[in-house]
């Protein structure tokens, strides 16, 4: 580490960059070159030094370097980074300490670094004003660009701008050089942007290029320069670019899916959208214009006559739009279709294909490109209801299926995949920055340590001489490090630290070592490293606001606050050292919370920090605070005693000498949990301080009696005081004079009388009841504001005004009293108080300006009072925090978004503005600019904003009509993809990430909450007291009632004892042990006095044990990890006590950490109670009933009781039988189905009606019977404790009541009718019967509390906008309409209400009416906001708002244009934030639920989980028998040809080509094209048939064993049949070309063969994995739709047909209702369906209209029912169910990506088996050893082993069975081990795979391996050695013999013998060689004994196998 700091950091580390420095660098470079002449590039990159990331150009200088000497600012200095030691660079630092790095070579070949010109340029460049100037220029330039038609003088301004930019570039080029070296001008990509902008400016100026406006738009790119100037933006842009890269796979998949769907659409709907209703041609001859003149010369009775005949021209007639049928107010003619379920034409019209397509001809499926556009529109769900309605009208309702598929698979899946990918890219980016930061931190820490050690050593030498303190300095040293180090943490960094902590926790759990022991963890924000002044922040809840304390001396607390940060299970607080030694409880989670500054236990034994007992695990909060606060409470700081205040309330824990209980005799702390007697801003009141001082200080003094203790304490104290003083100085933000000023003027404590007054006021204002009262006032005030409406009576208005004055008074009084009680200085130290002050001031200002016109907006500031609720409402607090947190992170993103919006708005204005003006008549009938145009900047901005909201198609049609298709498509698509899909998804990703579970931890313990809770507690206590008194009174007056007395006694007792406990805050253990009761009143710890102290709990938690956040005893982290370990079993007197306390702990621990629920666990936490599978029914009644009414107790042993019991048992058996259940399910389905028939035609179908009536009775009787049976069988107790049974019960009741009413003849009563509609709930009973749905519903029920919570918060949030809307728009939406034409009168004709009334008096056609959805009261305001937030129907509301003038005035076109901004702001906060918050909460909640269910997917049943797991690991495949190669030579050749990969791929290419030819088809193609296409198609059919035939020849009957082949076969047959019978099929079925589209499915197969397609495979795999869960959610959605459809039919069947309700889309029949509801599932078009239902009285509708064929009168709707119906449906389907869908996809996507990231994927295993099949054709699962080498080489990477691989294979030590065979699993394991390396996971995988393999292959004979390859090799080698030895021995013997013979026959032919001997030796050698080769080749080289053992076994198995085969045949 020391090496990275080249120079010791500090001010002396800077040196001027001089010629000598340059020479030195050159010398070093030369030396290096001499050392290695050819540097190895690669090597260098890998292992060489890296540039120090802290010293990068553009970053600020780390503050470890101290201040820069002023003479060195803006001067060239030597580079500080050791990496650049031999590179020609130097750095320059400006005043802000920013680092600029320059190349030391000559710029432009002439300017050396020492050239005065270059020096000046550098000075200018690094000056902060320079970038400011550029920034201002850019902004001014942007303002000029927004001018739509700029005046002439702006030309000169343009030149000025160009000049400034040129100047900037020149300065940069002179200072940096142009492009050759590093750090020159063009090396920075952002400068390329400048360069191009400037070049274009000059080019357009001097060269005439024709279309200048297009080029002028390039100037817009200058806005992008802001990005390069603002540092934070670059990172966000980086993230954006990353996510776009990541999106490539999704984009490919999306385009592919859309193409497939577009092809299907093309085939299905080609030309359909041109079907129009055309008038029947009249018979008279007046239609001359449509007739063709023909001159006919004919022979008439022999005389030639010339006659002119008129013939009718059909074609031109049908094209004439005058004869088409138009609905009023619609631009396009009415569509129709010729199929029975399509739209019909009115009388006198016929359906003909004529004219152009709808929407200027842009909406159609006529060619592939238009179809693709339509599908893209469907996918982004923009105005798709229109496309849906048009298509269904033209083609028929059955085609709804097509839309269902596209919406669910295309839209939901693909769009959310984009979200998932963007979110993951963001997450990765985050991870990277976190890791980098962590690394930096470690380095930085080491530097600090070094510096500090020196300083400390010096200090310590002076301070103490005693050897006994040798250990302290290090501790103190660390403390002071922290003091100078802990910069203020931003909330973001706190979050980052939390994330890091999580990561580290995971690492440690997975067996990490304690390597980051005393690593000091600190915020990552770059600037925090370089802050000069350090301030400590108490990091209480996730948000870090600073708190100041009641006296300047309390800085101690601030150390405590940050050092011992009170976060729960804080893994690393700001500052954490782990006791490195033999830490007793080191395996626990809080090991590094030991803030002990002592290194090992021995030293802790008698230290100030009282060590804890072995294995005792405390809640982390306790462990931290106990230690820390004891350390601080022991010595008075500056003579005053202060207890520690942390944000969890005040915990003052003091060590006292308690009885040594543990064998070791360690001291145990006594723990007292004090209630936070703190006022709002955390200051401790005087009285409390006094009390606490007296109560706790003496204990610690006793503790310190021991001299050694005292001495040690004092030494620590001194060191701490030093630290503290340093801290104090460093914490002060302002110059000291300000502190003096504030001490004198802002702290009022001069006169003692005043102090008394202050004290009294303090007691009053700080009382919890006052808080409660204020909260109630806030709620009341909000109600008062929400009561405003239009029209209001004078009196009501007066009441509201007075109310407002009263509330303003109350809040003002509160503020002033608080200021008196707290002093202004401390009052304004707290966020909430500043907020209060701000609001009060505004209210007072508003009262003053009440009568000023146009300032009514100030009234809306009152609404901010609502936010005061956040103090006492955790969820709201959390929401505001999340918005706060994300605004930080989103700030940059919002800027980027703003820049993008700006750029596109300007581009649009420049490119299309003129066209809108010129061609306006094309898009507007009156030739006036429409509302949405691009002629000026504001409107252009609105269009871009609208596109971001997802509405692009309508504005794009207009644009395409006026400005040409290509340009408009390009611009709009870019905005859509860049802005909407990427940036907005990044927005969502950020929101979701700030939503991570820890943020939701039911808001962190906030002392603010306590006040309310204390107040509520007191009320509870008061009530309990009154009850007790009443009981006592009763007891005295009626002595007889002894029983009551007995019941009350324990309660009474408990209360008395509690009072004792309360009175004495410092509970001494001996005396008050009996106070220690847990909530049930059982004493929990009399046994030993050991861990009792922890449970001394005071007042309020008796009542609110769980929901009192100030009590930090009970916050285990999750249900799975409660504090059982805390409770040492010996502490409990009995088993039962232990159990009980465990239960208590469990209850408290599930105080639902991660959810937004505040109290208790979610309702449906327990799985649904199923009746036990015993055949004995349970008791009928509850215990209570039996005790009260003795008659319920029946003996079942004899007589009637026995008969009754037998009856119950019989019933129980019946009910438990599967058939019974099946029958009931069948009945439920039938009765639900029956409801679907009750549509408007039921009265005309008499027989069906009668049948239904009888059926209804039958069903009711059956269900009643079922209910009775269950009552008898299960007993009331079981029946009525099951939620599902209650559901059944209520639904049966409804049927029963309506049945009785019918029998009594009351069926026409209104109440009974509405009850009948409740029968629609019948299908709900199916829920409990279908497991799949029940699972989803349980998950949903679990989420309901948090969903409701968020819903409430959203409502509060929206309330503010709603009240504001009422303030702005109430009564202003009224307008005067001409009832005949429906047009609004001009202002010139009608100016106000009275004018309109005059018109009405004169003639009847005018009417003064309101917009249906308006802001006249808060309720309607909510409805309007919902329409705006879902972007449906928002246009009408916005138009009305923008046109409004004032109450009772006629609106004028775009009168108050800037009202658009109200909606823009609402959309950003109300829609983007709150609706996405919904998604966040739901996803978060399901993850919570998932954890609870043990990480399993909660949307799946057991069966589906099995499927899911099978999908997850396909590794369970066994080697299959390949299709045997046919013996016939010709067949064999074909077989080889067909089975090659090339053949497959070529077929795929053919399929794609076939698709292309299908894409070429259009609706209006000529006959010539049609014939060519049909021929091409014929060729394809021949080719595919050929493929089919070839495969049939080669694969024989095996062809049909493969699914894909059957699929191909069917398609081919269909194509052939289709070719011959095309006409017939066209007529009766869908067009046969569709079957060709299905072939595309085969492309899925090819993905496996393409290496690059891995990403796409992952995406498809994620889809496959999501299917089971998505199916369940789909089922639930269907059920909801079904119920709502039936409800809709019974309520809205006869509504007037207008707006969205017409002859096809209505609630008249079940089918139509379903079609409507499907469309609303995505919230599309619900405003249109709601509008007619809001008609409640004439003249909007006619209540007496007769509906033919029905007894119902009138066509009015029921507004309240309608609003409830639609709003509830949207919340259920759109917000909840659809978001569940998203949650599943996100989840599975992350799982799938994790899977694909593993080194070995399923595909690799599959490839292994595919290759295996070739080597093991009989699927024996074994392979001979000699084949193995080839096999290993044949595999594909990563498993393959290229030859030569014999040695590697031998080294793998593979087990072999007889016959030298190796099992496939063993090989697979060995190979995977090679890829993954040795690890524990490997063994787990092995076991898993073996189990799976055994399961899938019961046939695997468990051959015992006899040997292994390694053993075999060793045996072979040994054999060779033995043989050699033996041969040598032989040889020796022979030689001996030979020599003996030789000696004998010495004289006879000696020479001859020598030759013989040579030959002999040669022969022996030869022999051994052949044997050697033999050995390696031989396979039977194992000793005979082995063979003998295994042969019979093997033979036996082989024989068995043959027998089995024979049997099989």
Curated annotation (Swiss-Prot):
The lineage of its organism: Eukaryota, Metazoa, Chordata, Craniata, Vertebrata. Present in cerebellar Purkinje neurons (at protein level). Expressed by myelinated, non-C-fiber neurons in sensory ganglia. This is Sodium channel protein type 1 subunit alpha. The chain crosses the membrane at residues 129-146, 153-177, 189-205, 214-235, 246-269, 398-423, 769-787, 798-820, 831-849, 855-874, 892-912, 966-992, 1219-1237, 1251-1276, 1279-1304, 1314-1332, 1346-1369, 1458-1483, 1542-1560, 1572-1593, 1602-1623, 1637-1655, 1666-1688, 1760-1788. Disruption phenotype: Homozygous mice display severe seizures and premature death on postnatal day 15. Mice show severe motor deficits, including irregularity of stride length during locomotion, impaired motor reflexes in grasping and mild tremor in limbs when immobile, consistent with cerebellar dysfunction. Heterozygous mice exhibit autistic-like behavior, characterized by hyperactivity, stereotyped behaviors, social interaction deficits and impaired context-dependent spatial memory. Defects are caused by caused by impaired GABAergic neurotransmission. II repeats lie at residues 750-1022. It comes from Mus musculus. One of its GO terms (molecular function) is voltage-gated sodium channel activity. Residues 147-152, 206-213, 270-369, 385-397, 788-797, 850-854, 913-938, 953-965, 1238-1250, 1305-1313, 1370-1415, 1434-1457, 1561-1571, 1624-1636, 1689-1711, 1727-1759 are extracellular. Glycans are attached at residues 295, 301, 306, 338.
